[in-house]
Structures are given as structure tokens and as C-alpha cells.
């Protein structure tokens, strides 16, 4: 055989340029790029070195022969002409891979059979023995590629694909192949950052592929150092002494690299099921001193290297399959950008995504982008410098009232209409409330609050402020009130509200609230689909002022949500009749060990998922679509903190029977208390004004009414808005 060979290296699509650079540095000459491959010239030492050190290649193919073919007979003759006794024992094992079509070969299986027959016939005619086929672990793996009438016959020196390093025996639902992860790290500048002693953090690390590949680069570890079986192991052209020399050199480099002080490389993963598999992968790679994986949400991501060094934040966020909800993904990327701006100033960042348009929601300008392919999915690597001059200001910004800054009324073409005497009285009351409550709201950093709640009987409205929007609910007038007069007063109030609060009249939304019955609390009022982001107690929540009777946020339960946030740390939290899971978001923000939220409505659970994603909380926060009573009867888990805020009445088509809070609350509480862990607490609240808690409950549980503790100043005028109790096991 010749001292030099033509090598053909395959790789994922999009890595050709990077692989060409890497292979050239490892000794490959006359390098040319092809789709998903490169080729060049090398001696045996370079071929071995490429197998051992290439972080990017899938396979290293040694080309035995190129020949033209017009039909299947030409294929057979070309393969048969090779002296296979130089490559394989006659009684050895063989596998054939065939790619391409044309020249009478339209079926790859047929093509592979032709190649196999030619090899077997050649060896049998000479030795009297024939090799057998072993597709899983052959002595020799032969590859033939048919390209526009030319057959390229090769030996696969790598055996199994080189991306299979051997450490990742456990993986998540959407794994990134190891060589693709290495390519992303190289494009992101990690070799340079590592050489400077920088840090690396992955806020959504899965089972740690980026982390392990980064550590191997930093510690100068050959990616395939631990591979025991190669495609050349039983090849008769193999030179064991040369291979041992190169392997020993790589082993020495790895030992020297690992002897250095380890770099700070950390990964965080929200899904507790992936933590141990990720740590196991790290240990199998021998990098336990270099790489640490912790459970953590994007919402709390804040890398703190030991020596306060900067470095690279790298992430492969979900982009379609892992969450499935486009809005949830949008908020996840938005939150990732927010954490980068707040906690990673001076760092570099790299986001690998199949949805690059979501990268625009991060609020940081990408200074460089690279195209990749993850299998058949086109992807982009977005690179960022986390520094103020790269921040995109104004995105997602909503008008807010700063302390001392009045609300600005939208320009109008003419003077506001003169108010009637009654309307002016209503406006005066509204302004008085707004002035008093505005100070409290600014102090408590509350975006949304009630400024009026039927303070004047003739104006039976609830007026809620949502930043620079007003949500007005008209209480249905009793039959004794003249409907025409009620309509006049409503119109007076609607004229007064924009003037009194300095609000654009187009941002006043009116609803009519009637006695709740059946499923009306879930009925869609409109189809605008306009969601607005508000803040409360350090969490962000989505409200919809137009489409439903309620907005997605029960303002009167604000103190209860804040209490849950304070008490949730380390607790297993259960939210029954969770609605849009605003209490769950507060529990997660407060450091709950786990959260489970149950509701019958898919609409509101989808909304809940968005609320969680908006704050960087993943799907480890369980959302269960179920009838609450049935769920409690079938569940055996224990919880430390339970919140129940049921509707007054419900007869959804999805549930068995009808729920009536007065009639059914004893059964509900008994079922829920059976799930309460010793030392735990259950909070029960409802808005039925005539509700009476069954007195016999206090004989079984420690019961305390806490209604007065759960009202903020904006609801102090209406202390019957809801009632709340605290229950503990005796």
C-alpha cells in the first residue's frame, strides 16, 4: 500500500469549514470541502491522529479506490479488483454501507449486496473461506459512495461515528450530538476564552453535553481517547505500534491538562430527572473536578465564578418540541436575555437555536451569527457581547407610572367633554382614591390595583388599573333600578374615567358582571388575544383585559399570593383550581421545591404555562388538567403548602356532576387535608359572599380565619370581597 492516502471525513451539514480548519491543523493536506464532508491527503499517522483528535468529524474514511461505473456489473468488477486479502482475514467479519444512487443502482440495499458479494467472492476464490456479515461490530466496515457515475470505495477507520465519545450513555429528550456541541463551542470562541482562564456556564444544560465538551477542550483531552474499539482494530493494514505511540501522547496530554487548576464550568437544569444522568455523564468523562451540575431555573440563573472571572454563557434553549407553546418559548428567550443583562455583564454569550427569530426577544443585539444544521433542522448560532451598548432598549417596554410622574393622556383633537354633575362627583371620588392608593402602589411596586369599588351606590362599578389600561366591571343593577337611568350613569362614568385618571379613552375596557352560573366564568367575551405583561411582588404575569370576564389575575388575592411566596421556600406546593397559576408563579419565585397546579380548563393551563415561562420557570412545575375532586381522590402525594381558591359554582362538561362551594367544601377540604404533610399549611379562600364554613371542620383540623390579613388597601373598602382560612393538621 502507498505511504499516503486519500481521506474522506464526514460531518454534520454546516461544519465543513470548521472541520477543514481542524483537519488541516492535525496534518491533513490538499483539503477540499464538500457537502457534509471534506477530503484531503494524509499518511497513516495523520489518519490515526484525526480519529483520535477530531472533535467535529463523524467518520474518517480511507479511500481504497475510485472508479467509473455504468451499471451493477461495473460496481461488482470494480470492488472485486481490490486485493481484499490485504485488508481482511478470509474468515473475518464484514459490514457494508452504501450511499447514493444512479448507474442502475436505485436501491442502496441492492448496492450494498453487490459490494459484499464482490468482496466475499474475491476472498473465497483465493482462500477457500468467506467472511461473514456482522452489521453491529465487524472487523472491517466498508463504505461505497456513488456520486454522478463515480464510485468511491473506502474503509471506515472510525467504526462507530466519532460523535459517540462514550461518556453520554444517558441523555434527555432533545440531545445535541457531541461533535455539533463542540463545533458550537469553537464558533463561540471557547478555546480562546478557556486559554485566558475564563469561565463557562450553561443555564439549560440538559445532560451536560456542552459542559463535557468544553472541559475536554480546556483540558486538552482528545475527544476519543477512551474509545476501545475502532474501525481499524482488526484491519490488516493497521500499525499497532504507531497507534500506541499516538495514544500514549494523547494520554500524557490529558493527564497534564487535568493536573492544571480546573476552570469554573457549571451547568444548571430545571428538570430534576436530568440532574443525575448529567452528573453520571460528567463522571464517565473523568471530569468530576472540572464540571458541576446543579438544579436551577433560568429565572435564578446567576453565574458566580470563584475568582469573579468572566467567560462564556452557552445555551441550546428549546425551540419547538420541548415546550410546544410558541408563547412560552418567546417568554423563555425573553427571560434568558433578561438574566444575561442583569447577572452576566461583561460576559460573552452564545445561543444555539432552531428559532432564531426568538433570539430577537432577548433584548441584546447579536454581533455575529453562524448557520448550522441540527440533523434536518436549520439552526443558527447567535453570539452576543453582554454589555450595555449592545442592549436593545424599548423592546417590550410598556408605559409605567414612576413616582411623581403623572399618567399622560393621549393627545385628543378637542377638549374633553364637559362632565355632568353626577359624573364630576364620580370623577372627584376616583381622583381622590387614585391619589391615595397611588402612593401605596408605588411604594409596594404594584402595577395593578382597584381604584374604585362601588364607593358611590349609584355608580355600581369596579374600576381596576392595569398600568396604563383601565378595566371596568359594571355590576348588574337590581330590577328595582330603572335600566335607562343605569345606562346614563354608566355612560357618565365612562366619560369621567379617562379624565380622572389621565388615560387614553381607547384603553378603557368595559365588562358587565352578573351572578356567576355554570361555566360563564370561563366563557370567552372577545377574541382579540391581546396579552399584557404586569408585575407583582417581583414576578411577571400576563393579563388579558378583553377576551374573558376575568383578566387572569384576581387582584383581591394579591396578599395571599405574596404570603405564599414568603412561605414557599423548600416546600412542595399544590395549587387547586389554579386558574392561570399566578399563585404558583409566586411559589416558584419564593423557592418552592416543587409545584403542582390543577385545573380543568386547558385554556387557563396554557395561560399558566406562559406565566411560568415568562418568569423563567420550566415544565418541572407540573400543570395537571383534571377535575380537582377526582384528582384528589386518585392522588397519593404529600404537599407542604396547599392553596385552594375554588369557583362558587361550576358545571363544566369535562367534570362529573356539579361543583357547589357551599355544599362541597367539606369533602374538598377533607380530600386536600389528606394530602397535607405533617407541619404543612392549607389556605382556603373563596368569593361567595354568603359562604359559611362548616363548623365541624374545626373539630378535625386547626382552623383560623385570616380574611382580614388577606386584604390590601385597595380592597379595604370591601371587606366581603373574599374570605380566607388557614388549616393545619391537629
From Swiss-Prot:
Which Gene Ontology MF annotations are present? 23S rRNA (guanine(2445)-N(2))-methyltransferase activity; RNA binding; rRNA (guanine-N7-)-methyltransferase activity
Keywords, alphabetical: Cytoplasm, Methyltransferase, RNA-binding, rRNA processing, S-adenosyl-L-methionine, Transferase
| Cellular localisation | Cytoplasm
Where does this chain mainly localize?
cytoplasm
Pfam families hit by this protein: Methyltrans_SAM, RlmL_1st, THUMP, UPF0020
Per its UniProt record, what Gene3D superfamilies does this chain match?
3.30.2130.30, RNA methyltransferase domain (HRMD) like (3.30.750.80), Vaccinia Virus protein VP39 (3.40.50.150)
| Catalytic activity, reaction form | guanosine(2445) in 23S rRNA + S-adenosyl-L-methionine = N(2)-methylguanosine(2445) in 23S rRNA + S-adenosyl-L-homocysteine + H(+); guanosine(2069) in 23S rRNA + S-adenosyl-L-methionine = N(2)-methylguanosine(2069) in 23S rRNA + S-adenosyl-L-homocysteine + H(+)
Determine the domain of life of the protein's source.
Bacteria
NCBIfam families, A to Z: PRK11783.1
Similarity section: Belongs to the methyltransferase superfamily. RlmKL family.
PANTHER family found in the cross-reference section: RIBOSOMAL RNA LARGE SUBUNIT METHYLTRANSFERASE K/L, RIBOSOMAL RNA LARGE SUBUNIT METHYLTRANSFERASE K_L
Give the HAMAP family listed for this entry.
23SrRNA_methyltr_KL
The entry's protein name is Ribosomal RNA large subunit methyltransferase K/L
- Organism of provenance: Pseudomonas entomophila (strain L48)
Q: What is the primary gene name for this protein?
A: rlmL
